[in-house]
């Protein structure tokens, strides 16, 4: 019977009598049980596994019924023995004792949130204790800014490169009222950043956030539709073009879906390069349906302001915006120029992140969120909301919601 041996048992009015017969067992090999008043005899066998093996399913007891051996859990199916990987009792030592411990580990693309190491020891009070956090159980949170296939930084969304490998897994696509497409950026398993203008696409300015929410469709990864629970607009969104989107459920993090890290320092410096992705219009002003990305440099802010002279420029500026639309330019924004191939972002890319790679910790961070996506290689600069300027509001909003 391989790892199985059988035990013949007689069930007598609820009392179990067993006769071990080694590897063979049959009801006929036992002496006939005496009859009793108001009761009857049932014959059964119990399969047991060899040492270091255990039953995969069922309790191993089979009753003979209608000329068939039946198990109450798995019916006519014979039991199987599998290797028992549970720990045996360790040997004792003189002048010492055994201490049991376990280690909690997170799945791929997740990490321990708590400061402990995940190791818990079973103490004399029958409690599992971690030396750092006591009885508090560890929590696993999503890894951010660590794509499995990062962008090839030697390559160079007007033009741009196709993101076929999921190199920017924080990029989401938002479809608003009247099927207007824009971008959003995943910052944890349940929250995304986008622009306030994106949230108002197809709506009048008097619309409330709760009325906007049901009109949004949001896609992450390979066109995975996720349900929006609510949107939160920045309290000063006319000057800080930002909003937050909360999902109804956490998204599973994998090689196609991963949040971008929020920065702990300012990565905005002139000529520093970063990457922007999106589903915006291409050089023919058509929506391609393919996620593309482009490498762009941070630009000089004074030159950018001069380029877009108008309502937001100093009083001595007189020229008008080259694209006929005035971007928001203030202490909360920064400008990004064209690539050396004259590539740029365009309509539909707003809400996407300007991400930079920190070589010290090999992690990608969101330095900015694209606000002004109408340059389309006609103007020289795109305009981004600086993420460090909104960090306090983002963290407070998430904590309160």
Curated annotation (Swiss-Prot):
Keywords: Acute phase, Antibiotic, Antimicrobial, Antioxidant, Disulfide bond, Glycoprotein, Hemoglobin-binding, Immunity, Repeat, Secreted, Serine protease homolog, Signal, Sushi. Disulfide bonds join 49-81, 106-140, 144-261, 304-335, 346-376. Residues 1-18 form the signal peptide. Its main location: secreted. SUPFAM superfamilies: Complement control module/SCR domain, Trypsin-like serine proteases. Belongs to the peptidase S1 family. The keyword Secreted applies. Pfam families: Trypsin (PF00089). It is found in: Secreted, Extracellular space. GO terms for biological process: acute-phase response; defense response to bacterium; immune system process. The beta chain mediates most of the interactions with both subunits of hemoglobin, while the alpha chain forms the homodimeric interface. Residues 313-318 are annotated as: Interaction with CD163. Glycans are attached at residues 286, 316. One of its GO terms (molecular function) is hemoglobin binding. GO terms for cellular component: blood microparticle. Tetramer of two alpha and two beta chains; disulfide-linked. The hemoglobin/haptoglobin complex is composed of a haptoglobin dimer bound to two hemoglobin alpha-beta dimers. Interacts with CD163. Interacts with ERGIC3. As a result of hemolysis, hemoglobin is found to accumulate in the kidney and is secreted in the urine. Haptoglobin captures, and combines with free plasma hemoglobin to allow hepatic recycling of heme iron and to prevent kidney damage. Haptoglobin also acts as an antioxidant, has antibacterial activity and plays a role in modulating many aspects of the acute phase response. Hemoglobin/haptoglobin complexes are rapidly cleared by the macrophage CD163 scavenger receptor expressed on the surface of liver Kupfer cells through an endocytic lysosomal degradation pathway. Residues 157-399 form the Peptidase S1 domain. This is Haptoglobin. Residues 28-83, 85-142 form the Sushi domain. Expressed by the liver and secreted in plasma. It comes from Capra ibex (Ibex).
């Amino acid at each position: 019977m391989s790892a199985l041996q059988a035990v013949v048992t007689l069930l007598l009015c609820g009392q179990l009598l067993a006769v071990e017969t080694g590897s063979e067992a049959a009801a006929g090999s036992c002496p006939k049980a005496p009859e009793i008043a108001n009761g009857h005899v049932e014959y059964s066998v119990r399969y047991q596994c060899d040492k270091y093996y255990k039953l995969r399913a069922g309790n191993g007891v089979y009753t003979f019924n209608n000329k068939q051996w039946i198990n109450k859990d798995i019916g006519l199916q014979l039991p199987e023995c599998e290797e028992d990987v549970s720990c045996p009792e360790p040997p004792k030592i003189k002048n010492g004792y055994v201490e049991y411990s376990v280690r909690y580990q997170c799945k791929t693309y997740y990490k321990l949130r708590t400061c402990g190491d995940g190791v818990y020891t079973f103490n004399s009070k029958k409690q599992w204790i971690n030396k750092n956090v006591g009885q508090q159980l560890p929590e696993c949170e999503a890894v951010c800014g660590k794509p499995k296939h990062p962008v090839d930084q030697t390559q160079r969304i007007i033009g741009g490169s196709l993101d076929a490998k999921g190199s920017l897994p924080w990029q989401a696509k938002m479809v608003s009222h009247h099927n207007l497409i824009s971008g959003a950026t995943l910052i944890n398993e349940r929250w995304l950043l986008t622009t306030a203008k994106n949230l108002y696409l197809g709506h009048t300015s008097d619309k409330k956030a709760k009325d906007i929410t049901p009109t949004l469709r949001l896609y992450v990864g390979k066109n995975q539709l996720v349900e929006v629970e609510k949107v939160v607009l920045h309290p000063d969104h006319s000057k800080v073009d930002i909003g937050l989107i909360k999902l109804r459920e956490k998204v599973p993090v994998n090689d196609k879906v991963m949040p971008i890290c929020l920065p702990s320092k300012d990565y905005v410096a002139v000529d520093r390069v970063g990457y922007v992705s999106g589903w915006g219009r291409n050089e023919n002003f058509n929506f391609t349906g393919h996620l593309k990305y482009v490498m762009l440099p941070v630009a000089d802010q004074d030159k950018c302001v001069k380029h877009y002279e108008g309502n937001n420029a100093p009083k001595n500026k007189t020229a008008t915006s080259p694209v006929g639309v005035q971007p928001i330019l203030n202490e909360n924004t920064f400008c990004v120029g064209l690539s050396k191939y004259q590539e740029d972002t365009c309509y539909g890319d707003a809400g996407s992140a300007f991400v930079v790679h920190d070589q010290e910790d090999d992690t990608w961070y969101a330095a900015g969120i694209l606000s002004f996506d109408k340059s389309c290689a006609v103007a020289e600069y795109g305009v981004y909301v600086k993420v460090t300027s909104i960090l306090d509001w983002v963290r407070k909003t998430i904590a309160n919601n």
